[in-house]
Every structure is written in C-alpha cells, then in structure tokens.
Curated annotation (Swiss-Prot):
SUPFAM superfamilies: Aminoacid dehydrogenase-like, N-terminal domain, NAD(P)-binding Rossmann-fold domains. Homodimer. It comes from Neisseria gonorrhoeae. Shikimate binds at residues 17-19, 64, 89, 105, 215. CDD domains: NAD_bind_Shikimate_DH (cd01065). InterPro entries: Aminoacid_DH-like_N_sf, NAD(P)-bd_dom_sf, SDH_C, Shikimate_DH, Shikimate_DH-bd_N, Shikimate_DH_fam, Shikm_DH/Glu-tRNA_Rdtase. The keyword Oxidoreductase applies. GO terms for cellular component: cytosol. Its EC number is 1.1.1.25. Changing residue 216 to G: In strain: FA19. This is Shikimate dehydrogenase (NADP(+)). NADP(+) binds at residues 80, 130-134, 154-159, 213, 237. GO terms for biological process: amino acid biosynthetic process; aromatic amino acid family biosynthetic process; chorismate biosynthetic process; shikimate metabolic process.
Length: 269
C-alpha cells in the first residue's frame, strides 16, 4: 500500500514530460507530499497500464499523446468538456471504482491567454492553425469565452471543415487566410521538426497575440515568424501546460494552484 497519494502521466514517449515537476510545485503550494511519476505505456497496452495503476492505489492520471482518444473510450463517465473534445487528458478515480474522464487543455490555454497574458478572448477574432486533437480539445472552452469569430485553417481542408461543422465555426484553406485576427493560435506539430504552417506573413498584421501550443525550442520557428511579420505579442505553450495541469490537480484534490509562480519556476529550469 502506498503511503502518499499517487498520480502519474501516461504517454509514449513519457520521459520528456514536465508534469512531475509541475505537480510537485502544486503540492508545495498545498503543503502536502504526493508521488507523481511518468509511465510509458506500450502502444496497445494503455488500458491495462491504467487499470493496473488504479488497482494498485493510483488516485488520478494525466494522459498525453498518443493516448487521449483511447483514454476517452476507457473512461466510465465524461465531463461535458471531454464529450465535446472527444479526447481526455485527465482521469479521476471515483470512490465507487469508476473512472471519470475530463479534458483540461482548453482551460489551460484560455486561462493563460486571459489571466497570465491579460488578453480578453470575448469579442475577439481567433484563427486556429491545425485540425488535430490538440486543436479539437481547446475549441469548446474558447467558444465559452464568446469570441466574435473562430476560424480554423488546416493543410488538408477536409479535416478543418469537419471540425467547423462539429463546433459551428468557420474553415478556410491555409493558403487563403488573410489578416484581421486578434489572436492566432498554432496547433500544428510542425515546430517539432522546424517547419512552419503554410500561411502568409500578412495574417499577423492585426495580430495582438500569436500563440504556439508547444513550448520552448519547438515553438521558436512559429513565434519568430509571427514576431518578424508584425505580431504585437508572442507566447509559447508553457503557460497552457501549467494551466491544464493545475485544472487536473484541482479535479483530483479540490485545491486550486496559483499557476504564475509555477510558470516562472518552469522557465528557470
């Protein structure tokens, strides 16, 4: 039996995850000791790994790529956010032995933009680049903030149109995107290999915030491009990472961490 409350992040790979450091900072704020580990589940072995974790005393888990859709199907019940996103990044062990799935990615993004970067989403025009799981996961919460308009652009138009129909937003081909957006969010994974979304530099001429959902070096190509093209402010996804983790922590423990000092702590590492 484990003496400390036990949590973990599941992914493949998982060794790079910053979640253990982030959650230990939250535990310091709460004044408690927790155990938080990384679990690299085999492809095809995720459900068994999660089952074993909870059966041996696990209290809650984060889920990262490539298991967010599988986590959705594994959960016994879902939050409205998870249902809308069709993906789960947080698993909560309930007292009756069932597992509840939630998605805190959108909360992390929206809180970083509105509370840390101090830019309101309400009434603004938003451009989302990419149409994968990362983008789908944040649209429901962005819509809750009542922007004037959300447009999604993707390399393959069909995927963008599918999300546009699902969420009642607009879709355009990347090559056809022009300016007129207050907030531009990059949800493509191109930065991981140094690639930029195939968009014109003109899209940044009215941009108040260019945001990349990945962080550190992976965000650099897009943010440099945005800055050089006229974006007034740029930000990587570290605040989103800390914010979604804080929302997960609150679901597990009923304690709401202050994300600002943790963002600064993670920047210094």
């Amino acid at each position: 039996m484990h003496a400390l409350p036990r949590y973990a992040v599941f992914g493949n790979p998982a060794a790079h995850s910053k979640s253990p450091q982030i959650h230990q900072q939250f535990a310091l704020q709460e004044g408690v000791d927790i155990e938080y580990g990384r679990i690299c589940a085999d492809i095809g072995g995720f459900a068994q790994a999660v089952s074993t974790f909870f059966e041996t005393g696990g209290c809650g888990a984060n889920v990262t790529v490539p298991f967010k859709q599988e986590a959705f199907h594994l959960a016994d019940e879902h939050s409205d956010r998870a249902l809308a996103a069709g993906a789960v990044n947080t698993l909560v062990w309930l007292e009756d032995g069932r597992i509840r799935g939630d998605n805190t990615d959108g909360i992390g993004l929206a809180n970083d933009i509105t509370q840390v970067k101090n830019i309101a989403i309400e009434g603004k025009t938003i451009l989302l680049l990419g149409a994968g799981g990362a983008v789908r996961g944040v649209i429901p919460v962005l819509k809750e903030h009542r922007p004037a308009r959300i447009v999604i652009a993707n390399r393959t138009r069909a995927k963008a149109e599918e999300l546009a129909r699902l969420f009642g937003i607009e879709a355009v081909p990347m090559a056809d995107v022009n300016g007129g957006f207050d907030i531009i969010i990059n949800g493509t994974s191109g930065g991981l290999s140094g690639q930029l979304p195939a968009v014109s530099p003109k899209i940044f001429r009215d941009c108040r915030l260019a945001y990349d959902m990945v962080y550190r070096e992976a965000a650099k190509p897009f943010l440099d491009f945005a800055r050089q093209s006229g974006a007034k402010k740029t930000a990587d996804g570290l605040g989103m990472l800390v914010g979604q983790a804080a929302a997960s922590y609150a679901l597990w423990r009923g304690f709401k961490p202050d994300i600002r000092p943790v963002i600064e702590h993670m920047k210094a590492l």
